[in-house]
Amino acid sequence: MKKWKAAGLITVAGACVIAIVWGLHGRTKNNAKLLQLDEQVSDDSVIYVALGDSITYGYSLEHAENERFSARIAAYMKQQGMQVVECNQGVNGQLSDDMWQNIKKGKVDLLDHADYVTFCIGTNDALLPFEFFVMQYEDYFYGYSGAGDDSSLWKKINKKTFVRDFEEADRSAEDNLNRFCNNLSDSIDLIRKASPDCRIAIMTLYNPYRNMDYEISAGGITINIGQYAEEKISQANTIISTVCKEKNIVLADCYEAFASSNDIVLNNQNAENYIDPDDHPTAVGQQLIADVFIEALFTK
């Protein structure tokens, strides 16, 4: 059995904590920008609102305002002759419940005038509890420092506590996904109530750990990072597909696009053994998301 070289995942979980703090910073910056956006709106404007988490926000991009997928979609719309006003409402670390609450409370500016809305949400709902679980046991999982499931350090751990904590994280993810369905559906209803003619598209989620086959066994269970993430992402994508069918929403299949891509679409693909903590899209990955949305919204 391989030792669990979990440094990448562990640091991602730590990055999620940082992302929440950055999310507050991002909201402040976005609020200032929204004042400028209001000044750009005219009767001929086409309003595009991008809702979502750190992927939408453009986390880790060097030039996020130009490289994130919403900017690339807006650029395409301008090429088609639209006087588009892009309103990026991505918030680092955001869960679907946070997004729904913001929509419900009227905190998403320009949404009541939106002509196009894209959703990129659900990865945190599906995976954040598991990432925090791994972070809790990081001292035991650092494969590169010699601690793994066959190490003397690992043998000292209380396996029952380990299994209990994993099961609690899994239940938390299941609770998140149960709410995810309602949050997504209710968010769409609120948007359509405010903007009945708005065109809405939702992307399926990529698995950020799809090639990570490190695993560890305890208490009769085996936890494989890539397989566990695949299971939860699959659940989220099933919910997304179901909501799209029920609500007649455009589905943008980014899961398949990422799975079949031969390009470096995620930052952690650049690092050996996934030591790089960043599982967010590269600029190439952001372009891929934009391409999938554009095809789904404008060419089908």
Short names for language-model regions:
Residues 1-14:
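N-terminal Sec-pathway targeting helices
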Residues 14-25:
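Hydrophobic alpha-helical membrane-insertion segments, chiefly the h-region
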Residues 26-92, 107-111:
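Serine-esterase "nucleophile elbow" of acetyl-processing enzymes
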Residues 32-43, 99-117, 186-197:
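Short amphipathic alpha-helices and their capping/turn segments at secondary-structure boundaries
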Residues 47-51, 85-90, 115-120, 199-204, ...:
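Structural recognition of the beta-strand scaffold that forms the well-ordered cores
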Residues 54-57, 91-96, 123-128, 206-210, ...:
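Solvent-exposed loop/turn segments at secondary-structure junctions
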Residues 98-175, 207-208:
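Oxyanion-hole/transition-state-stabilizing segment in secreted/luminal serine hydrolases
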Residues 205-300:
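Catalytic His-Asp segment of secreted/periplasmic serine-dependent ester chemistry enzymes
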